[in-house]
Structures are given as C-alpha cells and as structure tokens.
A protein has these predicted regions:
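Acidic, polar-rich low-complexity tracts and alpha-helical solenoid repeat scaffolds
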Residues: 6, 34-609
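Extended rod-forming repeat segments used as scaffolds/tethers
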Residues: 11, 24-25
Length: 609
C-alpha cells in the first residue's frame, strides 16, 4: 500500500531547511518567498487586475511577460511569473488549466519550485474530484529516487487521505489516516478533526465521542462531537437538533459552521420524525453556500432526499386533514392558505401536486406556486437549479414542468450559462403566458446562437419570418441583431440566407442598402468574391444612388478589393481609378494609389507568365 512506502521512505530522507516551507494541508505557497521578498510593481498590478475579476486579462499579460523571457538566462524571473500564474489560476478557479499546466512542465526546473507546483497540481485535482489521478502524482513523488526534505511527507500523506475521501474509498482513507497518526503522532486540533471526520464516515462514532471529548468548545469540534453523539445513540435526536440550532446562534458560529450545523439539524430532525424541521433544514443544506461545501462523505443528502421529505410531509398533512388523493384542488387550496405563515408546509403541498397530481392543469399551477415560494427564500434560485437539474424525479429536461424550465433559463442566463439555457430552450416551443411571443422567440433564437446551436437558431428565425408577414421597424432591428450574432459566430451561409429572406419585408431604402452590404460581407467571408463584389456594388448604387456619397464610396472600395481577389484585375483597376478621381482627402488618395500600384504589379506579373 502507498502509505507503507511512506514509512519506509522516511528512513532515507535527507533533512534540509527551507525557511518558507508551508505545513498546513491547503495553504498556498507564498508568492513573495521564493526569489524576492518584494514582488515587483508589475506583478502587483497584474494581481490587482485578476482580483478585480479580469482573470483572463491578467493571464494574457503574464503570457506576454514570459514569452519575452529567455528562460535559460532568466529562470528566476520566469519562475516568479509562473508562481503568479498558478496563483491566478487558483483565484479564478481554473483548476483543470492549472493541473494541465504543471503536468506539461519540462524537466530541469529547480526542485523546490517543482515540488511546490506539483502540490498545487494535486490540490487542483482534488478540487476536481479526481482522487486517483492525484494519488498517482503523489505516488511518483514518494517513489522517486531523488532525496527530498522530509517535511514534504506529511503534506503528501494528508493529500493521500483526501484523495481516498474524494473517491469515496472510505476504508482506504481510514487506513491512510491511521498510518499518518502512527507515523507522526500529531496532536494538533486540525489533525484530530480530520481523523474524526474519517471515523464518522466509517461508522465508528463511539471513537469520535472519545476522541473529541476535550474539543467540544471548538466550533467544528463541537459540531462533529454532536454528530457523533447522534449517530452513536448517546444523545436523543431531538436534543441534538435543539443543540445544533443553539450552536448556530453562538457568536463564534461563522458561515461555514452554520452550514454544517444545518446538515446536523437535518439528520437529527429526520431521525426524530420531525418532518417540517427536516424539510426546512434540508432546504438550507441543498441551497448550499457560495464558497463552502460539506466535508467529503460526511453526509448523504441529495435533491431526492428533499423531494421525498416534501411528499412525506404533504401526505402527513393530507392524512390529518383527510384530503383525498386525486382531489388536487384540496391540496392546492391548503397550500395557498398557509404559504405566508408556513412556506415550507406550502412548498411540500405544492410539490405533492406537482409530482403526483392527476391532471396537467393542476400540476402546472402547483409548479408555479412552488416556484413563486421558492424565490422568496434565500438562495432560492440555487435550490431550484439543484432540485430540478439533479434529481431522479426529472431524469430528462423535458420532464421538468414548463414554468420551471422558463425560470431555469432565466437563472442560467443571469449566470452566463448560455449552454444550459440553450439546452433547455430546445425543449420549449412557445412563449410563457403574458410574454410577447415575437420577442420571446427572438430571444430563444439568440440563446441557440450564443449557446453553440446556430442551425437551431437559424431555424427559429426562419419560422419567425414565416409567421410574421410584416414586421415593424423595431421588430426588424431586433431580428437583424440576432442575425448579426450569427454572422459574428462565422455562420455566414445561414446569416446570408436570413438576410435574403428578410429583405422583402424591408421597406426603408436606407436599411435595404445596408442589408446588401452585410450580405456582401458574408459572401466575402465565404471567399465568393464575385458575388461579394456584385452585392457591394448593389449597395453602392441602390435605388438610383450614384455611389459617390460616403456609404457609396466605402462600398465601391470593397467592390474594387473583391474584384482584385476574384482576379478581375482590369475591372478592379477601373474601380480604383474612379474612386481616385472623386476622392480629395490626401490620406485616402494615398491608400488608393497604393492599391493601384499593387494591381499594376499583379498585372505585370501575369503578363510575364
């Protein structure tokens, strides 16, 4: 086993002293301590850019700095930038990019930097829940023939434990933890808490009660001790539930502790048969926290745990009130009656009808009621996403009630998750009640385009044109904006077809003229230079224009360029000459003369051939 090798390896380690060594499990290597104590103002500036949200811009700046360096002669500077790069990857949570970057390192980097970077790679893999891959890297480090400072070993061994937890290999995690404590005899609180979590996951609650008996005043220690009391049966579930709520109100309770205590409250309430308290606590757990996760493997809650509790609670209410299964209106009326004073109770009743209702109308009404109430609670949007996108009750998107799908699209777009919004939109064909159908269908098409489904977007736009024989100026402009999105995404044939289809619906001459130009742009991008030249010229001369106004001159210049690319050099020469005659600005005349000179060289080259 890997941990056996660790004990052997300790005996042959060479002791070295590195003053900047980091001991705690997930503390990042300090960027100021490797080469210089004072980081350059340039690095500080780039870090500030990243900290203000422009992570990609910061990384691009680092790319430029490192690209200009001769690594062989400027290794120290290159390493400073590289450490900052990895730090910014961490800041932007770009874990996959980070781990791949380190994996691609070439040999020859200083050992102390290399080992630190590998540690960052392992941490990234653990964050990505790739425990096996992390263990393989640790194994290579441990079995390496190179001698390293023994202070690395406890760091690696702790990560081995973490890797087993990530992979839900709880028995191996316990063995690795036992070996760690046997090797290092650590008495620190952090190590005791880690050991307690692993013992709890392995159903050895009695040992946790004994282990943490002196740590009950420590915030997390008290929480784990409470959980051990619950699972060992040492304390009644109701008492544990009450204690969890009391601890949440303590001045020492930070957001992380409160979140974990809600999980303890949910488990204890469920064990005591307290349905409303269980449902309430589960909502807090599943709504999650922006930057906090429950300890790996310690609790086993899922979306279906809450759905099941909603139904169980609703059935309990219905049985007491003698509601009839199948009389959906009874259940809906009860939900409406209590939704202000008892929202969890109302959500349970709505969930019952939504999942078990006898007809589509009442199921949809229940879904709307459930959704409305859900958005009145903190992190309601997150809970909606979790309940409907990660549940066996809704194995495919089309099983999610339509009002909920509309809502998740809005949530997804608010979080810039266009791919999710696009996937949901493929299952929705009509606009929600009370929403302008044209604008909604247009929005649907745009989501498809931006979400990487250009063909579906084009089909949606084509249907819009078929369903609307005439379009107002405002509708035309919004329609064309989506076609521009399609053109920007380099779908030039689709955008050309749509420009052609909408052209007959346009009455304004100015807009017609502009449309020919945009159509020409698509043909130019497709390298159909003859068609592009024809369309640019049509734009220049549309409805009797002589093409001598600013728009016409611009279009004529494009005509000349397309003719040259189409190898129609004589026509291109004539077009440039016409433009030169009517152009007065010196700078533009210089450009035209340059183009004529290029044409002359091309024609001379052809004549020689």
């Amino acid at each position: 086993m890997l941990t056996d090798k660790l004990s052997y390896f300790k005996k042959r380690v060479v002791r070295k002293y590195y003053p900047f060594f980091v001991l705690s499990l997930f503390i990042f290597y300090p960027t100021s301590s490797f080469a210089e104590d004072i980081i350059s103002s340039h690095i500080q500036e780039i870090r500030t850019i990243a900290e203000n949200g422009a992570v990609s811009l910061a990384l691009q700046s680092i790319d430029e700095q490192q690209h200009e360096l001769d690594v062989k002669n400027n290794l120290t500077t290159w390493l400073e930038w590289e450490r900052e790069r990895l730090s910014i990857y961490q800041l932007g949570q770009r874990w996959q990019v980070l781990q791949q970057r380190v994996a691609d390192y070439e040999e020859g980097l200083p050992e102390i930097f290399y080992l630190w970077a590998k540690q960052q790679q392992v941490d990234a893999l653990l964050t990505l829940k790739k425990g096996l891959q992390a263990r393989q890297i640790l194994q290579n480090l441990i079995w390496s023939e190179k001698e390293v400072d023994e202070k690395w070993l406890p760091l690696w061994q702790k990560r081995i434990i973490k890797s087993y937890l990530v992979d839900n290999e709880i028995a191996d995690a316990l063995l690795a933890a036992q070996r760690y404590y046997q090797d290092y005899r650590s008495t620190g609180i952090d190590d005791r808490l880690l050991r307690a979590r692993i013992l709890l996951i392995n159903k050895r609650e009695e040992e946790v009660v004994e282990l943490l008996m002196q740590d009950t005043k420590h915030p997390e220690g008290g929480m784990l001790y409470l959980l051990a009391q619950l699972r060992s049966g040492e304390r009644p579930p109701r008492k544990v539930y009450q204690s969890a709520l009391r601890q949440m109100r303590g001045e020492w309770a930070d957001e992380k502790l409160k979140y974990m205590l809600w999980a303890v409250a949910a488990e204890s309430a469920k064990r005591s048969g307290d349905r409303p308290s269980t449902a309430n606590a589960l909502e807090f757990v599943l709504a999650g926290h922006k930057n906090i996760e429950l300890p790996e493997g310690l609790f086993s809650f899922s979306s279906d745990t809450l759905w099941d509790m909603y139904i169980e609670y609703a059935l309990y209410i219905g049985n007491k009130a003698q509601f009839l299964i199948g009389n959906d209106q009874q259940w809906l009326n009860a939900a409406v009656k209590v939704q202000k004073k008892a929202p969890v109770k109302a959500r349970s009743l709505y969930a019952m009808v939504m999942l078990k209702g006898q007809n589509e109308d009442t199921r949809l009404r229940a879904a709307k009621g459930f959704l409305n109430l859900m958005h009145k609670r903190k992190r309601g949007a997150q809970l909606v996403m979790k309940l409907f996108l990660k549940s066996d009750y809704f194995k495919t998107i089309d099983l999610i009630p339509t009002p909920i799908r509309y809502d998740i699209v809005k949530i997804a777009l608010s979080r810039s998750n266009v791919e999710l919004a696009s996937n949901l939109m493929t299952t929705i064909k009509s606009a929600p009640d009370g929403v302008d159908s044209y604008q909604w269908q247009l929005r649907r098409a745009r989501i498809f385009v931006l979400g990487g489904k250009p063909k579906k977007g084009s089909e949606a736009l084509t249907r819009l044109l078929e369903e609307n024989k005439t379009l107002t100026q405002k509708k035309l402009e919004s329609f064309l904006q989506v076609v521009f999105d399609l053109q920007t995404s380099k779908e030039h044939e689709l955008s050309f077809q749509l420009f052609s289809a909408v052209l007959p619906k346009i009455e304004e001459v100015k807009l017609q003229r502009e449309l020919y130009y945009w159509m020409a742009d698509s043909k130019k991008a497709q390298q159909d230079y003859v068609s592009a030249a024809r369309l640019y010229l049509r734009s220049a001369l549309h409805t009797g224009n002589n093409g001598l106004d600013p728009w016409g001159k611009t279009a004529r210049y494009q005509v000349a360029e397309m003719l040259a690319k189409a190898d129609l050099l004589q026509d291109a020469h004539a077009m440039y000459q016409q433009l030169l005659k009517i152009t007065k600005e010196p700078a533009r005349r210089a450009v035209l003369k340059h183009e004529l000179q290029k044409l002359w060289l091309l024609r001379e080259s052809e004549e020689k051939e």
